[in-house]
Structures are given as C-alpha cells and as structure tokens.
C-alpha cells in the first residue's frame, strides 16, 4: 500500500517535469527550433490540425526554419496560422516552402521570456508539491485506518520528501538551462 502511494506520486511528478519541459520548449529564444510550432493550429479540411502534422519543419540555419507542407493546398492555411500565432514571426512564401526567419530578441524581451520561464517552472513546482501533499494525506489515512504502523508511515513520508526534492531540483535545472539559453546573445 505504501509502495503504491510512493510509486503513483513519483509517476505523477515525472509527468509534471515532462509537462514543464514541453512548456519551456515553446518559449522563443531567438534560435530556430521546430518545437516552437507545437501549439500552432491551422484549418485542414475544416478541422483544426497542428501544423506539425501538416508539414515537415527543418532548420537549415540557426535562425531560420523551413516549412514544407505535405500538400501544397495547405500552404496558405499554414502561413496564416503562423502569422496569427503569438510567436511574433512572419513567414515568407516562395510557392514551394515557407521560410521563417527568427528575429533576434531584444534585451527587454529576453528578460520578459526569463520571467515567463520562471513562472512556468514555479507552476511545475507547485504541481509537484501538490502531488506530495496528496501522497502525505494518503499516508496519514492508511496510518489512521491502522493499515500501516507509525514508523513505516514516517519512513515513507521521508522517502516522499526526498523524491519531491529531486523532482523540484529537476525543474530548477530545466528553468536554469532555459534562462541561460535566453540570456545568451
């Protein structure tokens, strides 16, 4: 029972760290990164579809992305979706492919993005702490119900605390890496 609680808590914490990692990849850094288009959706035969499923996205140069639609008929929809997104980029259409040049970030914009990264990291740490709190409540309940002894529960609480600490450190290192990437000129 105690092992199940610890295992479930750890799985949920892993999921929170992965979610944070995905959130942080969507933050624009001034470098070309295909994952920045993960949240961009275009109309495809009347159905909202992620553009990552409608085209191949490559990085021919450090600050340029090349988007080649699988179907030429979707070119305008993809172009409009990128233009209307909040990414702040403007694609150029040469008939075959879309070229997206990533503008250099200003110092002010970099600092804003660092704040966004820290905020996303803090959200992930809050989620991890909430998972810990729920695990602690479950441990307290099984002790109260007499399913486990006080010593077992106390040891499990220490283990849960160690697990939580390691996942919070993982989030901190992700945010630190993103911050370093953002402030690099």
Curated annotation (Swiss-Prot):
One GO cellular component term noted in the UniProt record for this chain: cytoplasm
Family annotation (Pfam families): RRF
GO annotation (BP), single: translational termination
Primary location group: cytoplasm
Entry keyword Cytoplasm: yes
Cell compartments where the protein resides: Cytoplasm
GO terms, molecular function: ribosomal large subunit binding
Keywords attached to this entry: Cytoplasm, Protein biosynthesis
Gene3D superfamilies in alphabetical order: 3.30.1360.40, Ribosome-recycling factor (1.10.132.20)
Membrane spanning residue stretches: none
Domain of life of the native organism: Bacteria
UniProt similarity note: Belongs to the RRF family.
Known function: Responsible for the release of ribosomes from messenger RNA at the termination of protein biosynthesis. May increase the efficiency of translation by recycling ribosomes from one round of translation to another.
Protein name: Ribosome-recycling factor
Species this chain originates from: Corynebacterium jeikeium (strain K411)
Name of the coding gene: frr
